[in-house]
Amino acid sequence: MDPGVEKKKQQMELVDVESGGLPVERQDSLFREAVRAEHAGAAHWDEQDSWGRTMSLAFQCVGILYGDIGTSSLYVYSSTFEHGIGHPDDVVGVLSLIVYSFMLFTVIKIVFVALHANDHGDGGTFALYSLISRHAKVSLIPNHQAEDELISGYSSSGKPSATLRRAHWLKQLLEASKAAKISLFLLTILAIAMVISDAVLTPPISVLSAVGGLREKVPHLTTDQIVWITVAILVVLFAIQRYGTDKVGYSFAPIILLWLLLIGATGLYNLIKHDISVLRAFNPKYIIDYFRRNKKEGWVSLGSILLCFTGSEALFANLGYFSIRSIQLSFSFALLPSVLLTYIGQAAFLSKNPKNVANTFFAATPISLFWPTFIMAIAASIIGSQAMISCAFATVSHLQSLSCFPRVKILHTSKRFPGQLYIPGVNFLLCVAACVVTVSFKTTVIIGKAHEICVILVMIITTLLMTIVMLLVWKINILWVALFFITFTSTEAVYLSSVLYKFTHGPYVPVAMSVVLMVVMIVWHYVHVKRYKYELEHTVSTDKVKEMLESHDLKRVRGVALFYTELVQGIPPIFPHLIEKIPTIHSVLVFISIKHLPVPHVDTSERFLFRQVELKDYKVFRCVARYGYRDSLEEAKDFVVTLLENLQDYIRDVNLYTDEPHTISAHSSCNHSFSREKPSGRYAVHAEDMLTPIESFSEITALSNYGSDRLPHFKASKMNMEELAKIEQEQMFIEKEMEKGVVYILGETEVVVRPHSSLLKKIVVNYVYSFLRKNFVQGQKMLFIPHRQLLKVGISYEI
C-alpha cells in the first residue's frame, strides 16, 4: 500500500470513535510513544540476557573496566610499608587486610550490590543522583514537568506495602526540605569533584609505578630521570586523547587479560617458591594481631591498604553498556583470582625478602619475565589511566546537563560509540595537573597518600546515596538497608580517619583541587537557578503576548525563527525586549528550551514537546527539546529538520480535535491532581492555553474526575477530506517557511546583583560568575549554530 494512503488511513482510524462518554486523550506530541519505547527497552534487555552477548561483553569489559584495579598491585605494598617491615607477621596481617578489604568493598559492595543501582546501564555517583531525582523532586531548578514522567524508564510505582509507604515518606521529606536537597546536591558534586581529582592522580601513580620498575635492571637511574620519563609518557597519553580510543580500543581487553594472567601466574609462582604459609592470612585473626602489635601505626597504615580497591569507583562509573551479569562473570573468573594471587605472591616474596619492599612488584618478578612484565605494566597503566580520563570527560558532560559547570567544547571522537568524548580544555588542565603532581611528589608513596582521600570519600558518598536508593527506589526491607548502611559507613569511617590523620602529607592536594571545582560548580549552579527563577517570575503574560502580536507596528517576515530560552514554562522576558528593539516577527516563531532530564538517554521519538501560543494565526509555538545526560546535541541543521518534522506531526494531531469550550482548560476551576496512566483504559486532556509560571507545559488531568458532559468533543465521527486538506495546508506552510530560511535567536543574558546586595553575593555573581561566563564556550558553539544565521539579543537581569 502507498505510504501516503496508509498514513491518511491511520489518521482516519484515529478519529473513528464515538465521543459519547468514551474516555479520550488529548495527546501531546510525545504521549503516544511511551508504550512503544517501553517495549523497545524490554527487547533491549532481553538481548543483553543472551549468553553469547554476555560472554562477548564479559571479554570487552576486561579492557575497559579493570585496568585501574589491575594495576593497583604495583604500589600497595610499597605504600603500606613506607618505613619498612617491623615484624615478620606484619606481612600476613597486611595481606589479610588487603584480602578482606578488597572482598568487602570491591566484590560485595560494588560488584554484587552497587551495580544493580545502575541507571539504565549507567553507573557512578551521577547515576545514583539521577535515580533519586526521578523518584523525588530534589532538583534545585524549578523546571519539572508532568510530561517528563511519561518518558520511558523514568520512574515506576509499586503495590501498596510498608516499604512503599516508607519510600513515600522519604520522598515527601526530600521534596519538602530545602536543606535535604542542598545536602544531596553538595554530596553529589563533592563525589564528582573527587572523581575528577582522581583522574589527575591515577595516571601519575600508575605510570610512575610501572616506570619505576626500570631500577631493577638499570639501578643507576635517578629519581628525577624516572620522573621525567613518566612525564613524557603522560604528555603522550593526554595528547592522543583527541583521536579517541575506538581505533585501538579493541586491543584493550586482550592486553589487560594478558596482564591479569601474567600477574596471577607470577603470584602463584612466588607463593609456591617462597612461602605458602602466607595463606593463613585468610584467617581474620591476623588482622586483630596486626592491630594489637602495631597499635597506632597499624591504624595509620589503613590509608595505604585501601589503595587495593582503588579503581572500584571507576568500575561502577564506567559501567556503560555492559550488563551486570557480564561484569560479575569476568570479575569473578578473571580479575578476582589474578588480583588475589598477585597480592598473595608478593606477600610470600616479602616474607623471605623483607628488605625489597620499596619495589615489591618488580623485585618479585622472575628474571626471565621481567621485560615482558615491564612492557605489559606500562601498557596496563596507560589503559587504566585512560579509563579515569574518559570518566572525567563523561563527568564534566554530566555536570553541564545538571547546569553545574560552565559551557565547554565537547567533541565526539567516534561515530560508532557515541559515549566516547573528548573535551580539549579539560584534557589540557588534566595533563598540566598530572605533570605538576608527578614533578612535585616524585614518588608513588606520596602520590598514593593523596590518592587515598579520593577513593574513600567517593566510597562513603556512594554508600550514603545507595542507602537512599534502597529506601526510595528499590523499597527493600529496612533490616537489609540498616545492615548495608551500618556495615559500610562504620568501616569506611575508620579508613577515612586514617587518611585524614595524614592530611598534610598528601591528601590536601586533591582536597584543594576539589574545593576549587566545587566553588566553580556551586557558583555556576547558584546563578543559573537565580536567573531561571527571575525569568519564571517575569514571564510575559498571555494578554501581553496577544497585544504584541496584534500590534500594527509589528512586521512579518518570511522564514522560521528559533528563539532559544532556558525557560520551559511560558514566554521569557527577553521576547518583548526584542520586539521593542526590532518590531519584526517571522512567519513561524518557535521558542525552544533545551532541557536535560535525569535519565541517561531520551529516545528521539520522545524528544519534543509542543504547545501553540495564542493567537494561533501567528504560528507561534513553545517547544521543549528533552535530552538525557548522556545524549549529545545534534548539528543545528539536523536539529531543525527533526524539530520541524515533529512540529508538523503536532499540527496534525492538535487539529484532529475541536477547540470547543468543552475542552478542559488549564484554568478550569476543577484543578485535580495530575495522573499518568497508560493508554489502556484511561486517557487525559492537554490544555491549549498559553502557559504561566504556575502551570505545567501541558497539564494532564484524569478524565475520570469529570462528568461525561465535560469530555472533549470531536468535530465529527470521521474527519472529512476538507479538514484533512486544511491540516496538510498548514503543514505545507511550515515546510515552505523553512525553505525561506531559518534564523537562530539567542539570548545573551548578563546577570548582576542588586545594588544593596551583600559583598559576598557581589563577588560571586559580578566577578566569579562573570569571569566564568566570559571565558568559556559561548552558547552558539555549544548548539552548533552557524554564525551567518545567528541573531543575539542582549539583556541584563538584576537578581
Curated annotation (Swiss-Prot):
Q: Name one GO molecular function term.
A: potassium ion transmembrane transporter activity
| Listed transmembrane segments | 57-77, 94-114, 182-202, 220-240, 252-272, 302-322, 329-349, 363-383, 421-441, 453-473, 476-496, 509-529
Asked whether the keyword ATP-binding is assigned, the reply is no
Q: Which domain of life is it from?
A: Eukaryota
Transmembrane as a keyword of this entry, yes or no, is yes
Which residue intervals are topologically Extracellular? 78-93, 203-219, 273-301, 350-362, 442-452, 497-508
Ordered alphabetically, the record's keywords are: Ion transport, Membrane, Potassium, Potassium transport, Transmembrane, Transmembrane helix, Transport
Q: Where in the cell is it found?
A: Membrane
**Cellular component, GO, one term:** membrane
Q: Which InterPro entries match?
A: K+_transporter, K_trans_C, K_trans_N
Stated membrane topology is: Multi-pass membrane protein
Q: What is its main location?
A: membrane
Which residue intervals are topologically Cytoplasmic? 1-56, 115-181, 241-251, 323-328, 384-420, 474-475, 530-799
Choose any GO biological process term that the UniProt entry carries and state it.
Answer: potassium ion transport
Member of which family? Answer: Belongs to the HAK/KUP transporter (TC 2.A.72.3) family.
Chain's role: High-affinity potassium transporter.
Q: What is this protein called?
A: Potassium transporter 21
What's the gene? Answer: HAK21
